[in-house]
């Protein structure tokens, strides 16, 4: 039954006269909401920047710190409160900077420490806080610590990394210490010829894991990776792979989940280990002295109670964590890419969002809201539609509305605010894709299937849908050459071909653009932070596979959010959540604000006094 009907009007108590263009400020006036004083990071929106791809200031084809500096006014115009800059430290760039060779220096193509200090100061002058990526589960194999560690078994830093002797079969064949599989494929163990032992790497062989059980090593990490930058004025860290510092010390074999594979998924043995909370308490003592916030990356942790141990205020561990329930929707069960495009249903997505939202209900914890980052493909391509320009805009606005109404600290990734989408299927996986994870997976499929054409086709389709490369292409600033990202003849990574129409400059002139809508929603979220940022989340009609309806409740007020996840018009009957005559239309993704059926990828929000229970 459409919401223009008598039945629907009775169910929702929505005045039929509310069909005019949405007034983004009306909620603050009509709902008489308040904004309670809280730590700055709880109400914040954080804008994530991938330095290599954001803006090139010197024409070498690679983004840099001065490029970020040049666009601070644009970032300020979005209405965000902080920026999170992905690793800008010195690095061989095997894993795009997540392999750090010197925490106290900047990767030369990005700039210098002095450039970083200027960027921090300029951001602060605009009221923008600065977060850096803290990557301390591992270093690069080029880091001086590892170079010393591998030089001999007697070196004082030998125990700063995790070394183990080989195992040998009856016939004398050398084997690694266990069967754990790396996050990027293959064994987690790499043989060192010089010292005749294996070292552990949960990611690339060029990213050896630090031994957090060594106290001297830990304190060197705190000084070099944390205090060095906190002393230069940063406001906090996004903490990479924060739950991997403490491993099961027995290094037993992982359960065999796939008998056809030599190496097995072992996250249960290297995540959330026995000393994790001891280590984080040490870190927190330092961070607290600087009044710095933290957001931890917490993969492979579906257990709510384990997550709460990290983010409960009384535990004094982390300010918040990224849970991966939402962004993992549609992934393969064992291997991320062992799936097919759009392998998900709306009820499954609803469940994932519900789990992350309800983390803070009845607890002293805090959560995050996000659908994109440097490790995820574009949300419109995954959860909306990029089939046409019209559908891209509609679904981009719908997802923006949804995210802006979710509780927790909101994170927006560069390009998300203009509705950037995945690179097209015409891109060559072996040429245009640059990410180590993409390349490793494709080569794994080719080797396993002996180059089977259909298997390669399936792998390419999966990468086109889920690869990290889609987040790492250059930012689309204008319709100029290379999307205005660089004046170089060729950028470090190919620009997506749709930049002529999909870019910042074009959208800044268009009041109906995805960019304009994101700006409006972020202001709306700020004005109504108690309800939209801190309100309790209630899921309605879980089984509906086309429409997502949820309610936010705070202090006797409710917001009802309805989202059409299809390109079709859908009749919609809202649940009765408001007192009679109390509901008012807050916002719609369609400018005309019409009532009636939910149109293609439409999102609407109503607000009012909650119905007495």
Language-model region placement:
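Active-site and adjacent substrate-binding regions of carbohydrate-active enzymes
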Residues: 2-613
